Amino acid sequence: QISDAVLDKLLAYDPSSKVACETLVTTGQVVLAGEVKTKAYVDLQLIAREVIKKIGYTKGEYMFESNSCGVLSAIHEQSPDINRGVERQDPMEQGAGDQGMMFGYATNETENYMPLSLDLAHRILQVLADIRREGKVMTYLRPDAKSQVTIEYDDNGTPVRIDTIVVSTQHDDFIQPEDDSQTAQLKADEEMLAKIRQDVIEILMPRVIAEIHNEEVLALFNDQIVYHVNPTGKFVIGGPHGDTGLTGRKIIVDTYGGKGAHGGGAFSGKDPSKVDRSAAYAA
């Protein structure tokens, strides 16, 4: 999101900007790197901090907080060797900055032509984020979360039922152990997990299902769905403090969730002259 925010701001002020922005985030630190050719000036620190705040990293206990994290920039000018292959006298003859393989994929499983399992996983996380921002229920939620949906298909490639739903969501340490013993800690962790699992099934999923208006998709939900909620048992440490993040490291969830094919090039932080992005969109 930070890489795309930098790109958006540069294109807003200079539509001819050539941008390849990468972002690395880890405990208390953001590093921006890449190559840019533009006539615009943008405040990289402000852009990064606004995105981090919008996502929800606003507390020091997360070990990654919008106001206090360091933001370093190692962005430099685009290579003239690359630029000479991109910019031409006739804009209609614009070249590509690189070669590669790009793929498109579409399915009639959903109204947006995306694979059903990916669409449902995205819906789950979008509703989970809405619940967290509303702050009325599941008030222990923290910003980091992941989801995966496994669907059973028949021999004709038609979805017949949802088999498994995985929801991993970061949370506060909202139940404290009675003492310092390992037994007490395990008991507190089990109580937290039970509460989160109950809320996922009784609060989150009904809201997700309520937003689905396709009768064929609704028919896939059943009482036999296996729910894996925070399978490790605890998810207090998360975000960039728990897992270092890097632009382009999750290319499958950014595309078709394992369906179709992928040429390996990420999308975020790249202007349309980068065919990794524009050609994949065109396909």
Residue spans for each PLM region:
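C-terminal catalytic subdomain
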Residues: 249-251, 256-283
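Short, hydrophobic/amphipathic alpha-helical packing segments
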Residues: 3-7, 121-125, 201, 279-283
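Alpha-helix N-cap/helix-initiation motif
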Residues: 41, 113, 117, 189, ...
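Short glycine/threonine-rich loop-to-helix capping motif typified by GTGT followed
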Residues: 35-42, 232-248
